[in-house]
Amino acid sequence: MRSLVAQEKFRNIGLIARSESEQALYSLRQLIHFLHGRDCTVILDKHIIGHLPEMGLQAASASQMGEACDLVIVVGGDGSLLGAARTLARYKVPVLGVNRGHLGFLTDILPSEIESRVGQVLDGEYSTEKRFLLDLEVRRGRTVVGEGSALNDIVLLSGDSVHMIDFELMIDGHFVYGQRSDGLIVSTPTGSTAYALSGGGPIMHPKLDAMVLVPLNPHTLTSRPLVVAGDSEIKIHITTEKVRPLVSCDGTEGIRLQVDDVIAIRKKPHRLHLIHPPGHDFYQACRSKLGWSSRPGDNN
């Protein structure tokens, strides 16, 4: 993380939120009034413009925001930010999160602090982190049958079946193992506090240039999470015949697989520019979100 104090100040701001969340829409209205008071140009996600017709704002897709805005604010949970990140990363537009969800590792501004914390960011008081994403390609013979990207993780699952999956893992062209399990999580450091953590994987600091591979209920007790270099190329060869597994990016709708399909995973060339207000601390976030104990008398 590097500090960007009193440098770039944002004026063209895009807003993204979940339309089905009344709490998010309430915070959006508050945010719009505040931004107009700061003489900012506001562009609203086209999927929610119909829920706020009284605001009279310009509507745009996430891609259009990436081209036109110098800051995008996502109001919602980490899932909302994950969806925005997969589109916005290629445009290098900074992204700021307001938490209207659950854990909020990525959306770290509380609703009660919207005006004060967003105000600090508009004044040029913020820090930024560059988080890498993963590219997914599914190959069937010489044909690419599916693609995707993920900020958190790419997950191989058994899908609708209760049977285990058989697959072979290759890293940078080297055979690692053949495994029978319920699946495999390939996670970035960002995703290490999400599904990978539930699967027994390690917490990885966001600065790390690494990936972690976490087996899901492997049939052998010696199959443990494996941390590899961030520029590694991961290939998973599906060898199971009884099951039609799924591979999913950040929990989105999966790609159905069949025997002899090959999943190829590598780091994307573009990174997400994630903005934090002053005082952001990864370890404090872990204490708050994961219930770690604090010093006596310390509320954080």
From Swiss-Prot:
The keyword Transferase applies. GO terms for cellular component: cytoplasm. Keywords: ATP-binding, Cytoplasm, Kinase, NAD, NADP, Nucleotide-binding, Transferase. Its EC number is 2.7.1.23. It comes from the Bacteria. Its cofactor is a divalent metal cation. This is NAD kinase. It comes from Alcanivorax borkumensis (strain ATCC 700651 / DSM 11573 / NCIMB 13689 / SK2). The lineage of its organism: Bacteria, Pseudomonadati, Pseudomonadota, Gammaproteobacteria, Oceanospirillales. The gene is nadK.
